[in-house]
């Protein structure tokens, strides 16, 4: 790495430490993201066709909404399978992202905290408000990871204000973990009296933009008032050489197990 690049990385790190987040514009290859979006949609559309719903709709969005209402179990299964697409995982461990975590965010020994999360947010595809508009919370509460843990987020389309973009509160990571207990959906919500709504910043990112933020940063999602689905991906990383993480004994709070038949219905 040349001196100029090293200085640039250090300046970005200083900004990241102060603000708690950094947005890198046009960081990811558009073609890779568009291909990933097609793969995700193919999973749902395959079941739209299999359930003989394709003849009743003109657009993909109509098809997935019909699948949601006609066969929710299959819809939910599709939602689970898109979390495990190979290209979703490949992006999370790509050299470009890992190098950024190490060279800019200064993770010494990055490790994956939990599986990737592919989010699809729309009021027409939700059984609970939490599935389309997530209140302000801190990921650090549920991660229980390293003190310098990082969350990476990026959209799979241009995300305008109407789509309900990622919303963050700059510098809120400096408050430490102030979220209360984790709820049934796995979120550590922050009481509204602990932050100022006037400080909220909406990140209207374009396709290819990516956001790196401190896991303690207070954030949530805007309200998607459009007729479109907001697609995005999120990844979480710990630092196995972080002293606090070492002293805590490397807790890993995520439970992976096969589901019982009654749970799958």
Report the location of each language-model feature.
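Non-heme Fe(II)-dependent double-stranded beta-helix
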Residues: 1-18, 25-136, 142-143, 255-260
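Non-heme Fe(II)/2-oxoglutarate
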Residues: 2, 46, 50-54, 62-69, ...
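Short, solvent-exposed loop/turn segments at secondary-structure junctions
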Residues: 28-30, 118-119, 141, 159-161, ...
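Residues that flank catalytic or metal-binding motifs in active/ligand-binding sites
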Residues: 84, 114-115, 148, 162-164, ...
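Active-site rim elements
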Residues: 85-90, 195-201, 220-222
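A structural signal for well-ordered alpha-helical segments within the folded catalytic domains
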Residues: 95-99, 150, 206
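Catalytic core of non-heme Fe(II) oxygenases with the double-stranded beta-helix
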Residues: 102, 129-203, 242-253
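A structural signal for short, well-ordered beta-strand segments
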Residues: 116, 152-154, 233-237
């Amino acid at each position: 790495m040349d001196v100029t690049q090293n200085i640039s990385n250090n300046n970005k790190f200083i900004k990241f430490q102060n603000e708690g987040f950094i947005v890198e514009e046009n960081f990811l290859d558009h073609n890779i993201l568009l291909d990933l979006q097609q793969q995700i949609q193919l999973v749902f559309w395959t079941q739209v066709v299999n359930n003989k719903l394709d003849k009743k709709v003109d657009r993909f969005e109509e098809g997935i909404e019909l699948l949601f209402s006609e066969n929710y179990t299959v819809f939910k299964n599709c939602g689970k399978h898109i979390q495990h697409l190979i290209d979703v995982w490949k992006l999370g461990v790509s050299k470009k992202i890992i190098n950024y975590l190490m060279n800019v965010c200064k993770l010494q020994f990055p490790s994956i905290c939990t599986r990737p999360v592919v989010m699809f947010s729309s009021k027409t595809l939700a059984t609970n408000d939490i599935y389309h508009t997530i209140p302000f919370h801190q990921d650090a509460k549920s991660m229980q990871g390293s003190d310098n843990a990082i969350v990476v987020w990026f959209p799979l389309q241009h995300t305008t204000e109407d789509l309900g973009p990622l919303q963050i509160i700059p510098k809120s990571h400096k408050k430490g973990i102030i979220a209360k207990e984790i709820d049934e959906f796995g979120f550590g919500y922050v009481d509204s009296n602990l932050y100022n709504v006037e400080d909220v910043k909406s990140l209207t990112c374009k396709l290819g933009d990516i956001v790196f933020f401190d896991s303690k940063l207070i954030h949530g999602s805007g309200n998607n008032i459009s007729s479109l689905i907001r697609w995005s991906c999120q990844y979480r990383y710990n630092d196995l050489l972080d002293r606090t993480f070492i002293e805590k004994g490397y807790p890993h709070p995520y439970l992976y197990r096969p589901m019982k038949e009654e749970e799958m219905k």
